[in-house]
Amino acid sequence: MFELAGSDGSYNGRDLPDRGDMISPMASTGSKTEPGSVGTIETRFLNLPRPLRLDCGREIFPIQIAYETYGTLSPARDNVILVCHALSGDVHAAGFAKAASAASTRDGFAADDRDGASGKSLGWWDGMIGPGKAFDTDRFFVVSTNLLGGCRGTTGPSSINPATGRPYGSDFPVITVADMVRTERAFLDELGIDRLAAVAGGSLGGMQAFEWAVLYPKQVDSIVAIASTHAIQPQGVAWNAIARNAILADPDWQGGQYYGTGRKPDAGMGIARMVGHITYLSAQSLGAKFGRRLQFADDIRYTITEPEFQVENYLRYQADSFVKRFDANTYLYTSRALTYFDLARQYGNGSLVDALRNVSARTLLIAFSSDWLYPPAGSEELAAALRTLGKDVELHIIEAPYGHDCFLLEEARQTPMVQQFLARQTV
């Protein structure tokens, strides 16, 4: 295990030892505490040694990457799975965080009911990562990072701009999903990891998996894209625009330069979270949990300012908890990046088949019947294009009522699909 320099746990990539000495076979960032768990996990930080050229034409430097690892790296360094998070996710994917968040990062419908008090420190995909789980840490070395533009340790709008000595704010460069993936590639280079056994993620994480397969076809053996797509539908673009405009319309956004002022756009950010959260659910799941039940069981209160229905109170709770852990500018930049994502436009001159022509990775696609934000049709179109090209692709559509959040909730049904897919892979 290589030593981390600095009291903040950071390591300057420019001073890293030789790549062959950087990660020992035992370099997990956690210690096991109970069966099936990767244990208590400490987030680490690494600074990339070189600037990154972005799709917008700008360069960014320095770049700090927050990361966690689970499992044991094989001597041949050929058992690595990179897990990529969704818009509201972060670096902490599995186990119990050594430093718990102020608010739970466990998304998914009724996550608090499911997780109880442990939710504040539990990784967002803990049910999928660990010994004997879908991404089996007895076999694989799983790496999770916070994406570029994030607010949980990786360089983003809240980071210091070296040109001014102040947080970037809205001076942060506009980024794309491809920029996120190039950053991940540069990070793995510093860890001496050349090839990935798999790249996996749900939602925006699945988009990153496909970017990996297209940008680095000779460096990725498999991808697992769950509840994802090749391009978000116009309705999804519209919902994301509404969420961003809620933030932009908040006077406390202050043109994006709100850091250190004592005011931040919590009202707009809260509305953005409400909008986003509803798109992650389904009419069926909302109806089953809340129906039209009143917040106060006796009667309506004749108020236009306070929640009258339980579902309204639930949304307010979601908003209040989200603003405690997430930065509004990160939401703006990440939301914009995922709406830009369009494989056919980026790589195929409008043709999805042409965009995927050079992909060599085996592909597992999992979609959910009630997901209207990333509907199964997107996964079906990806599967059809890959089959047209004679690629190795597997598609499963799970009948489930929870909407887009199924990828965080249907872990028990996803697990055998992922396990069987990865079992066909030689490591």
Describe the function of each predicted region:
Residues 167, 171, 178-197:
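Conserved acidic catalytic loop of the alpha/beta-hydrolase fold
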Residues 195-234:
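Conserved hydrolase catalytic core segment
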Residues 225-321:
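Alpha/beta-hydrolase-fold enzymes
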Residues 68, 76-161:
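N-terminal cap/lid subdomain of alpha/beta-hydrolase-fold enzymes
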Residues 346-352, 375-385:
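Short alpha-helix in the alpha/beta-hydrolase fold that links the catalytic acid
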Residues 2, 13, 19-83, 92, ...:
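Catalytic-loop region of hydrolases
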Residues 389-427:
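Catalytic active-site module of serine/aspartate enzymes centered on a nucleophile-bearing elbow/loop
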Residues 359, 365-367:
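Short beta-strand/loop motif that positions the catalytic acidic residue
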